[in-house]
Amino acid sequence: MIKISDEKTWQSSRDSVYEVGDSYSGQNANRPLVATNCSEYAVAHANCQLRPVRRFAEVSLLPDILETMRNLGLNRLLRLQSYTWPHLAGGSGHGAMIVGSPASGRTFAYIPPVCHAVSRALMDFTGQCEDVEHDISQPDRYGPIALILVPDLRRVHQVSAMCLALLRKAHKNDSVTLALNVSSTKSSQFFLKLLNGVGCLVATPAQLVWFWQEAPGLMRFPCLQFLVYDDVDLMSREQLQDVQQVLQEILPLSHSPQVVMVSKSYCHTLMSKLRAVNDKPALVFGDILEAALYGGTRIRISIMRSEAKANAVVQMLQQCSPEEFRTVIFCSDDGDMQCLVAALEVQHYSCLPYYQTADLEVRQQVHSWQARSNGVILLCTDNCPELDIRDAHTIIHHSMSHSWSKFKLRHLKISDNLCNMVKPTASIVKKPLYSLVLLDDNNHRQLPRLVDFLQLHQKVDHRLVEVAKRIRQELGKARNDQHQLCDQILVLGKCYDPVCESRHRLSHIDRRPDYLPASGDVKVQLVKVYSPTHFCVRLLEHLPPKGTWRMMEYSAVQEFRMQLTQIKEPRRYWPPVAGAICMYHTTFTKERVRVLKVAAIKNTNIVQSDLTVKLQALDVDTRIFSTNCGKLFECPEALQQEAPLACDLRLPGWVPYFGERSWTEENIRNVNLILTQLPKDHFLQAKILFVAAGTLFVQDLVAIMYADQFKAHVRHLSLARRLVEATLVKRSENAAEMIREFFAEVIIEDDIDENVQDSKEKANSKPHEKMKGKMTDQPAKLQSQPPLSGRCLRLANMAHESVKENQLHQELQERRYETPEIPHQSNESDIPQSNEDRFSQLYECIMNCASLQLEDESKPAKHPDHVLSESVEFHKIMTNEDATPDHTQEKTALLLLPNNVARPSVTYYQTMTTLEFQVFLPEDDHDYKALLLGAQLFFRAISKSSDLILQFIMTLRFPYSSMSHNIRGRTVYISVKKLLALIDPLAFREYRFLKPNHDLFDKVDKQLQETQNRLVRFLEDMNYVKRNFEGQEKRETSEDEEVNVEGIERPDCHKIWDL
């Protein structure tokens, strides 16, 4: 691990030469090198003689740069750097292609010599300014001395910090910018700095194209000495073509800088371009396996049983005779080697096994074999670094290595026989080079990675690819992690990061969960903006295809119910298992999370608190974060069954406008500002394209408002259009297609499930229609229908009696109209004529309820509204059973409303004198009526713009005297006055559309408690009662604890106080 010894001093002396808004970061300057990727060996080819340095003291760099590197802890000279540093310091024409694994020191293989050349050029420029009056604005001083192109913004900041760290002490002129990034805000300061002179300009290909388009006439790079393509394999062909066109415009025709290319894999096309501009190119490999493939080695893979591996070795030896091809066979250990030697000697092959107990005599035999093999086969293991063999022709991997780096290092045995393709007169390989990999049941897990590597260089048999895919799926299920999908795949359809640790394959967890709709439109509530095309939302309503809007469960009520289900003193969750749901506790919050990844657990019987786990939030948002398992607690089983409150929403096919692979923080802030400054009465709506990996992939996110003048909904904002206008995104059909192809497997499975469900619903629709017909033809026989529950039976009886009473009243009124007595006529004229309409509407409402209940009982037990059913069961548990009459113990069937009839969203709370209801209407164009008849409360609201009817009827089991109501906006406030100033037990569990308003319950509860506390203190102060200090302490402590616990229902909410 690399450390900074003087970090405080450097951060305190922050320079203004860095881009405005960016500060020097020590973390970016020192990136730790991964030991397994840093090879002690390298393969270097060139058309000139390479003179590698052996020790750090032999490095010829400026003293300031060497001192800075020592302060950074870069005291170790890697083999890769020992070739590149002296070669790049050779001057013009000395280009290089560096091929190595990420985090293997390949970036520092070019940065020190580049910074050395920049410092020398700046010192020469300063000397000229001191000796002669030199105009800084001369055209020959425009532009940078070194141009470094990197694939993404993250690498821009990392490479810039490295260059600035090495250049900070080399030059003190404030007029020249040492390290410059392309500004993401298109500021004019960037062009001014570029005109005044720049040491190192670090940019992405898209940024280079952008600032050339902004000022094509001003951009000239006459002083450019180095042109570096870092991670050139991660740049697309279109990006490289655009860069080439820009460079042809900004570089003089007579000037050709030193070109350096850094790549993970070798590419013949890029090497040809390098040789075209530099006459002394060098090709340096830090990855030995890449060097083997470059040099003409043919790799074969065979999968078989362990018993058949010896026969496969014999067949390979028959094809490539050891008499002509020097052969090395790798085994796992000495025992494996003994068995193979015995099998080969039976076939009359001469073997030279090199065991771990080999003595000097065996070493002498190996030296003789290196001079002349004479058909003898050398057998060894990976634990023999003293075998200095470089001229083998055939390598047979009888057993695979324990690590990927050791497997690649095996091919060092054929490095001297690799063809040098850099030389114009490269000799053709006389003997082909082979590498045979034998896999069995014990080492088949290495196949997926080996297949991925070979697919980059050669065609692989499709059967091997399928086997590798199955093995990868099995390993993913067995592994104790459920990594999130790679973000680049979800945005671009492909991952370009070679060291990405996210998941890049589909898994069973990517199928659409039941709580997310598969198609249609949704109304959502915005929770958080992750990027211009990635959001965290909560679902409010769903519009199925050819259906009507359906309310999703109210998130606030669901969240409160989940808090009630939590255990007050939960147990620690151990051992954590990937995919499990648990509780994450902090100082002030508790939330549900899903475990994604768990570090290795040595002993599950020993509970650890510092074990690292990766989690994903489920309710607050969908963020992914890491913590220690000491903050994890068990989650109740009922709470684990609850659907998550939050989900991800993405706009597929929209990519960064300038060709980047990610957005800046400023872009995210701008999008967040757009979505948070919408008008008050808006709602967000999106059309679902498909659902996968817990994410809604939608066509667009639009903000819709209701226009009173037109009496219609209008679109206020289209997010995709706004982002295009702000030059934040652009449409990429290729990315959209790749994303859909990536999820094709789970999308097809969801379509099949949806078709099956639709066929079941159509099969069940005929009995429902028959039920409706019976209810319409015989409304008077509702009392004798056996399927009616207690509640609907009471409503039907009441409606029947009301109709009879209304008929008798009409007959009496007609008779009185026929009599000539004027007084009677005037009295009857005072009776409101609206009673007839009121009772007819009441009768219609009750008939709808009864019809819907009969229709519901004929449906299957399982239906899409399972969340509502679960909430009823939960409410039964939380409600006091003694306060409910016996007939409410009967199971109430779930009512499925017709298309034009729906239950409104209603909340309630009570004070000491009233029972308060709040009815939420979807639009403000509803005409409503509310009526209190005895113990029955009726409500009905009819929309003016559609045939939608919102209604409910409920029975109050507490004596109430009168009712008042009013409407404000889209909310109807109903207040029912009590006859007695007591607390109603509120046995409302059979009314599923009613939701308690817990915030106001707590407020009333707190006021009553404060009143009671004041009364107790008053009685104690007046010495009417004995002061109880101990009880007071306990009471105050419990009050403080309740105040600190937010969102948890108090146990006194529904109790009756005796005052």
From Swiss-Prot:
According to its UniProt record, where is this protein located? Answer: Cytoplasm
Q: Which reaction does it catalyse?
A: ATP + H2O = ADP + phosphate + H(+)
Q: Where do we find the motif Q motif here?
A: 54-82
What name has this protein been given in UniProt? Answer: Putative ATP-dependent RNA helicase BoYb
Chain sites annotated for binding ATP: G100, S101, P102, A103, S104, G105, R106, T107
Region (Disordered): which ranges?
756-787
Q: Name one GO molecular function term.
A: nucleic acid binding
Q: Function of this protein?
A: Involved in primary piRNA biogenesis in germline cells.
Q: EC number(s) in its UniProt entry?
A: 3.6.4.13
Organism for this UniProt entry: Drosophila melanogaster
The answer to whether UniProt assigns keyword Membrane to this entry is no
Residue intervals of the Helicase ATP-binding domain: 87-284
Chief place where the protein resides: cytoplasm
Motif window: DEAD box: 230-233
Annotated keywords: ATP-binding, Cytoplasm, Helicase, Hydrolase, Meiosis, Nucleotide-binding, Repeat
Basic and acidic residues composition-biased segments: 757-775
